[in-house]
Amino acid sequence: MSLNPRDVVVVDCVRTPMGRAKNGCFRNVRAETLSAALIEALFERNPKLDPKEVEDVIWGCVNQTKEQGFNVARQISLLTRIPHESAAQTVNRLCGSAMSAIHTAAQAIQTGNGDVFLVGGVEHMGHVPMTEGFDHNPAASKYSAKASNMMGLTAEMLAKMHGITREQQDEFGARSHRLAHEATQEGRFKNEIVPIEGHDENGFVKLIEEDETIRPETTAESLGQLRPAFDPKNGTVTAGTSSQLTDGASAMVLMSAERAEALGLTPIAKIRSMAVAGCDPAIMGYGPVPATKKALKRAGLKVEDIDFWELNEAFAGQSLPVLKDLKLLGVMEEKVNLNGGAIALGHPLGCSGARISTTLLNIMQAKGGKLGVSTMCIGLGQGIATVWERI
């Protein structure tokens, strides 16, 4: 493949293991510490990458308060070998924050405003709960349903509109855990996971090397025993078919193709196109459909051209309508979330965009796929998507 000088390439990408938000393995580890460990690991894994080359550290984070406040990207950068002369910014597009960090860096590279960027995201949902400090504007109810702020109810709405049954959701949830467990057992996550020191259930320091969130014993039958979590009387969405609340971080090295060549670094993929789109907040989970269609059009591609997909599993009742309308249900077992998804691994809000992209790129490398798409829904009615091409 011939690369243009300003093509945006990925040199390396990593993530932490995913820890449960409630009394999990990272209950005594801060968000900045998780992120800084990934940046240090990227420098260790890529000795030709000079910290002085970094133009900007761009980090996604949703709830920017407490340890995640006051420009957490800069707080993270100051914990690493990156010099003070390099800049840092925190971005927030709710669930799409880390993917927006990728897009922000990519746009800078494409326009000649920098060559080397460290991007990623973090959310410590154990230390900073999802709605910590949020004050909803009552006037917003004139323009969108108040229930649009309750993600589980938006999933209920989307599932009902598309005729998605409780049984289909339970099957999808069980699939996520089964595939994530298989990926762990077969070592498919090893290249992307950076082991991080945490604590076991007894409080002893332990090197965390695998995701804490996967429940291999999960079946559709066991999920079928759970009560609806958001609409107790008529609902179909349960805690078992929703993304888990977790603590985690993800990180990538993005740079221009010409700078990667000059530094002697071998890129693993390039960005073909990017897109964001909006939708009705009441069905916020539908956002990946318009965003993906827009990104594919910009790349001159069709759905059937894509070898592998990573769709953030906010809810099974949200994922299945998206796959249905993208005409992917028939090829799901061959192409979609082959190592499980957020139902098994969790969805640390500001982290997930780079996490699913990291997992996708590792799948593409392992299986030899040429083209991949990572896409996700975003609270209050948005979607974001990235088209990747393996090098």
From Swiss-Prot:
Protein name (database record):
3-ketoacyl-CoA thiolase
The task this protein performs is described as: Catalyzes the final step of fatty acid oxidation in which acetyl-CoA is released and the CoA ester of a fatty acid two carbons shorter is formed.
Q: What class of enzyme is it?
A: transferase
| One GO process term, biological-process aspect | fatty acid beta-oxidation
Q: What is its EC number?
A: 2.3.1.16
Q: Which residues form the active site?
A: 95 (acyl-thioester intermediate), 347 (proton acceptor), 377 (proton acceptor)
The protein's matches in HAMAP family, at most eight in alphabetical order, are given as: FadA (MF_01620)
The membrane spanning regions, by residue number, are none
- Please give the family membership noted in the entry: Belongs to the thiolase-like superfamily. Thiolase family.
User: Pfam families of this UniProt entry?
Assistant: Thiolase_C, Thiolase_N
Its quaternary structure?
A: Heterotetramer of two alpha chains (FadB) and two beta chains (FadA).
Q: Does the keyword Plastid apply?
A: no
Q: Which PANTHER family match?
A: 3-KETOACYL-COA THIOLASE FADA, 3-KETOACYL-COA THIOLASE, PEROXISOMAL
Pathways per UniProt: Lipid metabolism; fatty acid beta-oxidation
Q: Recorded GO terms, molecular function?
A: acetyl-CoA C-acyltransferase activity
Q: Please write the reaction equations for the catalytic activity of this protein.
A: an acyl-CoA + acetyl-CoA = a 3-oxoacyl-CoA + CoA
Q: What does the UniProt keyword field contain?
A: Acyltransferase, Cytoplasm, Fatty acid metabolism, Lipid degradation, Lipid metabolism, Transferase
Question: SUPFAM superfamilies per the record?
Answer: Thiolase-like (SSF53901)
Q: Which gene encodes it?
A: fadA
